[in-house]
């Protein structure tokens, strides 16, 4: 695996000699704007694999994306390769419909230590809950970013990530009650501990997420990609573009329902990916929000 090929894939041409917050932020921002958060393989009859060599080939050489266990593992490899002190952590995603965090450790995130300070770096949550910059690991501090205000809170060794969103404006009134829209401005995202993890700790969950009928990932095909102004999302046949802080502290969200013949073109032109096999889009049951 070639680190220069990774940097070319994400379009990163800046310095990688300084192991500082600016470099970490720059690499994270480049990856989330180049590598989609997506699970389309499993809706093309293919597996979402965890092997680093396979992930490198899939994302870097074949120009695809992946979910957190893939894109954050790739980010972990890149950061450690150039010398950042990086640790894998395991997260539990908040499920609004159940009003609780997942019982299984279904999310991979990273802790990066720079000059004695700890930061959370996560390139694998997607949609409008995706952080654009690393979050300093400080409890109770509001950390404003373009997507929203993020806040980390620690209670008895467990850390919680929340976000405070802006109001939303949806010009197409047909979608005002869409299940894809977050229902509140204050949203819980996930919880985690600082216990170091290895990728092997996620293997059984990686299988469960793409095979269990109770997994939201088996009923929902999704693809999201950050832009300098917002985020594109494709869930089933529904394409959205959210422009952050369009005006008056409000996000603008544009909706479009695609026909089957448009999906491949949208994936190529907006998300910059091409699939090797036919995609069967699935709309899900409201568990994925944009």
UniProtKB/Swiss-Prot annotation:
Catalytic activity: an arylamine + acetyl-CoA = an N-acetylarylamine + CoA; an N-hydroxyarylamine + acetyl-CoA = an N-acetoxyarylamine + CoA
Annotated CoA binding sites: 103-104, 208, 214, 287
Root EC class: transferase
Leader sequence segment: none
Enzyme Commission number: 2.3.1.5, 2.3.1.118
Keywords: Acyltransferase, Cytoplasm, Transferase
Gene Ontology CC entries for this record: cytoplasm
Binding-site positions, substrate: 106-107
GO MF term set: arylamine N-acetyltransferase activity; N-hydroxyarylamine O-acetyltransferase activity
Principal place of residence: cytoplasm
Short name of one Pfam family: Acetyltransf_2
Subcellular location(s) of the protein: Cytoplasm
Active-site residues, Swiss-Prot/TrEMBL: 68 (acyl-thioester intermediate), 107, 122
Alphabetized PANTHER family for the sequence: ARYLAMINE N-ACETYLTRANSFERASE 2 (PTHR11786:SF6), N-HYDROXYARYLAMINE O-ACETYLTRANSFERASE (PTHR11786)
Function: Catalyzes the N- or O-acetylation of various arylamine and heterocyclic amine substrates, and participates in the detoxification of a plethora of hydrazine and arylamine drugs.
Family statement drawn from the similarity comment of this UniProt entry: Belongs to the arylamine N-acetyltransferase family.
Official protein name in the record: Arylamine N-acetyltransferase 2
Organism: Macaca mulatta
């Amino acid at each position: 695996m070639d680190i220069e090929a990774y940097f070319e894939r994400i379009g990163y041409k800046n310095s990688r000699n300084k192991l500082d917050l600016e470099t970490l932020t720059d690499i994270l921002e480049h990856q989330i704007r180049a590598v989609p958060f997506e699970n389309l393989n499993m809706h093309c009859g293919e597996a979402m694999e965890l092997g680093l060599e396979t992930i490198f080939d899939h994302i870097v050489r074949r120009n695809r994306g992946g979910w957190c266990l893939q894109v954050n593992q790739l980010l972990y490899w890149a950061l450690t390769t150039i010398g950042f002190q990086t640790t894998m952590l395991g997260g539990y995603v908040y499920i609004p419909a159940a009003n609780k965090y997942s019982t299984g450790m279904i999310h991979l995130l990273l802790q990066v230590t720079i000059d004695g300070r700890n930061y959370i770096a996560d390139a694998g949550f997607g949609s409008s809950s995706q952080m654009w910059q690393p979050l300093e690991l400080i409890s109770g501090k509001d950390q404003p970013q373009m997507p929203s205000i993020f806040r980390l809170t620690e209670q008895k060794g467990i850390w919680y990530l929340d976000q405070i969103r802006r109001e939303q404006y949806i010009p197409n009134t047909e979608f005002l009650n869409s299940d894809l829209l977050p229902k509140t401005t204050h949203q819980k995202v996930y919880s985690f501990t600082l216990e170091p993890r290895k990728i092997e700790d996620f293997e059984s969950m990686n299988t469960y997420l793409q095979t269990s009928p109770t997994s939201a990932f088996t009923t929902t095909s999704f693809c999201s990609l950050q832009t300098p102004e917002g985020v594109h999302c494709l869930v089933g046949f529904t394409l959205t573009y959210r422009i952050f802080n369009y005006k008056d502290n409000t996000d603008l969200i544009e909706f479009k329902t695609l026909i089957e013949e448009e999906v491949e073109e949208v994936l190529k032109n907006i998300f910059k990916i091409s699939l090797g096999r036919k995609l069967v889009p699935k709309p899900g049951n409201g568990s994925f929000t944009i």
